[in-house]
Amino acid sequence: MTTDLDTLLTALYVHIDDRLKTPRWRGRPPRLTDAELVTLAVAQAILGFHCEARWLRFAHAHLHGLFPYLPQRPAYNKRLRAALPLVKRAIRSLAIDTDLWLAPLWIVDSTPVECARSRETVRRSDLAGWANYGYCRSHSRFHWGLKLHLVCTPAGLPVTWALADPKIDERQVLAALIDNEPHLASTRPGLLILADKGYIAAELDHFLAAHGVSLLRPSYRNRGTPHPAEPLLKTVRQLIESVNDTLKGQLDLEQHGGRTIDGVGVRVAQRILAMTCAIWHNRIIGAPTTRSLIAYDH
């Protein structure tokens, strides 16, 4: 493990331990604290371990200097699934702690999160009723699973996100994200959101305008006069694609291995937290590339 990753994990542990302390459990305190648990989960995502058993074998062999106590797989899995609210709070806390948080420009997009392939796995999955069949136009393929709807800044810093049934309209999810946390938009006067053609809807435009938000997306050729800034969309849209590529190509989002609602949720959040942590730390140390994981992934 490199000294760069060692420094990042130490900074993350201190941040969580100082700012996100959870109420103490009844009885004997856990031997692995919540801050250590989240830090261990981030290290797993950055180093690319999909299998928790293999990850814990590696941790027992190489990370005892950072983590005096390391649990076995059942205890780690149980604690990690229960820590989903803490992981979400950590994502938000790190994002707020950067100078990118109040950026008046957001980019929104969705990407599939496959959860099963075989018909038998779909039939027996605990995700039935939450996951569903969907179609990914960019890859021209059907999948069974969920969709990750991510709202981020141009630098890739996650602002808010949601996992949803792939059959749910993207416009409904965006409206729900804004409606669920209206303060995110109200604290950014003149907020502009960039999106693709999937977000075209007069109803969505009216809803966002009521929250003081403007939406810029490509217009259809036969519908009205295009926005003067539309030629810039193609360049800016590549940013969100690169964010999705970071999550899938470097943090292995589609190899999450989750089989339950909590399991999928925390493993997706684990990867978003790892990316957020890298952005946060790179801004602190003045790294030339904000979203680079190269210094930490080996």
Annotate each predicted stretch with a short phrase.
Residues 1-298:
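Short alpha-helical elements
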